[in-house]
Amino acid sequence: MSCGSPQVMMTLWTLTCVGLILLGAIRLSLGLDYDLESFDYLMEDNPEEFDYKDPCKAAAYWGDIALDEDDLKWIFKNKSNDLRNTRHNQTHPTTDNFSEKLGTGSQNETSSNLNSKKVKKGSRLKLLIAEKAATETNSTFQVQTSNDRVRRAATSRTERIWPGGIIPYAIAGNFTGTQRAIFKQAMRHWKKHTCVTFVERTDEESFIVFTYRPCGCCSYVGRRGGGPQAISIGKNCDKFGIVVHELGHVVGFWHEHTRPDRDEHVSIIRENIQPGQEYNFLKMEPGEVSSLGETYDFDSIMHYARNTFSRGVFLDTILPRRIDTSVRPTIGQRIRLSQGDIAQAKKLYKCPACGETLQDSSGNFSAPGYPSGYPSYTHCIWRISVTPGEKIILNFTTMDLFKSRLCWYDYIEIRDGYWRKAALLGRLCGDKLPDPIISSDSKLWIEFRSSSNILGKGFFAAYEAICGGDIKKDSGQIQSPNYPDDYRPAKECIWKITVSEGFLVGLSFQAFEIERHDNCAYDYLEVRDGFSEDHALIGRFCGYEKPEDIKSTSNKLWIKFASDGSINKAGFSANFFKEMDECSRPDNGGCSQRCVNTLGSYKCVCEPGFELTADKKSCEAACGGFITQLNGTITSPGWPKEYPTNKNCVWQVVAPAQYRISLQFEVFELEGNDVCKYDYLEIRSGLSSESKLHGKFCGPEKPEVITSQGNTVRIEFKSDNTVSKKGFKANFFSDKDECSKDNGGCQHDCVNTFGSYICQCKNGFILHENGHDCKEAGCEQKLLNAEGTISSPNWPEKYPSRKECTWDISVTAGHRVKLVFTDFEIEQHQECAYDHLELYDGPNGKAAILGRFCGSKEPSPVVASTNNMFLRFYSDASVQRKGFQAKYSPECGGRLKAEIQTNDIYSHAQFGDNNYPVQSNCEWVIVAEDGYGVELIFQTFEIEEESDCGYDYMEVYDGYDSTAPRLGRYCGSGPPEEMYSAGDSIMIRFHTDDTINKKGFHGQYTSTKFQDALHMRRK
């Protein structure tokens, strides 16, 4: 595979890798598989021109191990050397795959023969890997002994450490709000447990960018410097644990299993490694790493799992060695930082031994030893970090420090930001309590130092986050309290934003998830065009859809967030900035007709019947027009001749209110195929170019009849400057739409039918008894109908995150539930560990499981063994898909269990409502426990009568199948009395032909103790 075509080779839990810290050279962590054949671009003449900021273009780009800068220089330095000089004669079990892939000959091959072969670009890169692999001993069965202290690799080059532990970041715009929340949760996790700080990038030269590169899941290890560097979160990598792992590489960690001493702790089973992935298991040299005094960490979040890059899910590639005689340690967790990870990061960044990161909305801290007295030469740092848009109130309730001039010896410094270079809010000592200190933003830095021998009791301080407030700056961010975690109940926050005079306020949402309600009655975000609650309402928002970008009409914007005391969601994150209305300029933005302002820009548009010229500002007469007729015909320019090139025609068709417009094509022939890249016809409901799109059409195939959603249609035709075709001819006509007025009285969807209409509810809601309103169906449904359809929440749209839904399906007694899937698309995972659908063979989740499903392949039909089936659907916090739809129905027959209590059996699922169906063949086996027999009695019996019961009939056998003695064949009014089995089972067979059908039968069965008189009475 090339850099442009990554492929996930293992399931996410096999992408686990845990960690060492980078040694001086740039190294890259990936969780993907790439073919060595595709690195031709590494053989260019100027290595200095490579973009190391993009992991895909760096030399370090292979799987989970990579080359460093020195390796890359080695490649170019030796580019013209004889391939035979690269240890071609060296053989080793671990290099067989490389030799075979490289096409290397035997050891006796001459240099001239080798040189006569055409050397493919990139082959030297492969030989470098082979050379490194060849230096290792086979660690599957051998253990290296060493008296050296256990190494845990850490960078020895200070330029790879982020100065002050500050890592600026930016997030690319193509990520969803849920993904952004996961990134921030992962960064908060690192901040909470170490002294590393992630801050949104402002003007910093070096920073990381969350992006989606072709390398999939990858990152540089440590700070690259000199500009942005990518941390790629590719497909299926947007999980909390995986992002924490990738951030570990950014901080400076490398993979644990590549340590020089790894063979003392794990065995590498090379024969189980996927071909081409052997380089992921190479060891680092002892000279490449320095020790931080930390032992090998099986629990590290940077460690590979046992089957990473395995030929099969159940084959180990890394096997932990047993500690003493105990069980093997678990490796590959992706839940949280281990204690070893935390300890090593603190050593790498020289974190103070005293202090912590405080992220709760309120809390307290105190000097070490308080109130008994702090020790001399103490250094502590506390970092308070709350949600953007909140401020921090800091109160000192006790203060007793050695007092000196200018607080030179013992002191507390409070800074208005995330580090020691932030603005100083106060330097405190002595015993005088300061006034409450309020931050200007969402972070405070508190540093305590003692250097005197005269000690005091210390201090005690408490803080609280307050949301809302006046914000006077040209750009910034606001978030719901506690974002990206769920917001807190009973909160009210009001922000009053003011930007510079002469500008407007722009508001753009990155994430939005607030408790849903039709009228946003419970939790909501309210935005007003001004500086108070009395100004014009722009919108009140809730639910899961991000609001459109918002723009004020002045330099002020009022925002209110409110939550009630019950359901809490992830909340929102939004950026605000100053915005200019270019269309308000005297020259109308340079547009000859209409100027439309957009956030951050503007565009020129033309009136109907005109089109933009090449300068995108002027308008000229065009084909198309404004049509108000109820019926008519529209044709391409020049019809019936070929249409001209370089045409752009727009027709706007308007019918009276409560009418819909249908468009039917007689002829259609445009250049192109299904891509519609050159000439095309675009049809929308509405009059603007951003209205709902019905379709974009080209080629020779006529579109189906298209009906508008309202009383307007926009038809746009475009041709390029080359091929012309015959064009199109279409007839339009109008029909009254009852749904267009007040939505037909329907709360959700009104569906117009010919001469009438019906109301429908969105998925997750059910229609009220009044036929118009909708009520929430909830996610726990008990289904008692004989048959029906179920679907995931919001189907066919993407299901919501963090959802758990259950369905308890119960069909007619004596029948089995059959489930057939008609649509299926759930996040893929080899073990369905994330989003999944579970089916159980009974009325609840304690029954035997029938299967756990995910992915995009429709499962085969599933049949329960009884008349109950239980379904549970679960979605996690990240990837969402379309979901599923399935139909359930009763399947006659099956194996039934006779118990002491009476159970029912019916001839068909619609018994009592409809006669039994024709051409049916059903078999039931009723089984009792050992020592018990089966008693069968019929309450109702009505089957087509015939003297020999040759048409429709019921047969009863004294055993498990038709080889057992037959107790009788019955039709008409059925058996005259109850029946008893001689053993522990009875089989019932019901057959109908293709003609007359009757009411059917209703039987009851129980288990009884064997009594000879009863059980032999049938004889």
Curated annotation (Swiss-Prot):
Functional summary from the UniProt entry: Protease which specifically processes prolysyl oxidase and maybe also chordin. Required for the embryonic development. Predominant protease, which in the development, influences dorsal-ventral patterning and skeletogenesis. In embryos, inhibits the development of dorsoanterior structures and ventralizes activin-induced dorsal mesoderm in animal caps.
Name under which the protein is recorded: Tolloid-like protein 2
InterPro entries according to UniProt: BMP_1/tolloid-like, CUB_dom, EGF-like_Ca-bd_dom, EGF-like_dom, EGF-type_Asp/Asn_hydroxyl_site, EGF_Ca-bd_CS, MetalloPept_cat_dom_sf, NOTCH1_EGF-like
Residue ranges occupied by any EGF-like domain in the UniProt entry: 579-620, 735-775
Cofactor: binding details: Binds 1 zinc ion per subunit.
Annotated Peptidase M12A domain residues: 153-352
Enzyme class: hydrolase
UniProt xrefs under SUPFAM superfamilies: EGF/Laminin, Metalloproteases ('zincins'), catalytic domain, Spermadhesin, CUB domain
GO biological process, one term: proteolysis
Keyword Plastid: no
Residues that bind Zn(2+): H245, H249, H255
GO cellular component terms attached to this protein's record: extracellular region
Chain residues in the propeptide: 32-152
Signal peptide: 1-31
Alphabetical keyword list: Calcium, Cleavage on pair of basic residues, Developmental protein, Differentiation, Disulfide bond, EGF-like domain, Glycoprotein, Hydrolase, Metal-binding, Metalloprotease, Protease, Repeat, Secreted, Signal, Zinc, Zymogen
Keyword Protease annotated: yes
Compositionally biased tracts (Polar residues): 104-116
UniProt-annotated catalytic positions: E246
Main localization, broad class: secreted
Cofactor: Zn(2+)
Molecular function as annotated in GO: calcium ion binding; metalloendopeptidase activity; zinc ion binding
Subcellular compartments: Secreted
Annotated S-S bridges: C195-C351, C215-C237, C217-C218, C354-C380, C407-C429, C467-C493, C520-C542, C583-C595, C591-C604, C606-C619, C623-C649, C676-C698, C739-C750, C746-C759, C761-C774, C779-C805, C832-C854, C892-C922, C949-C971
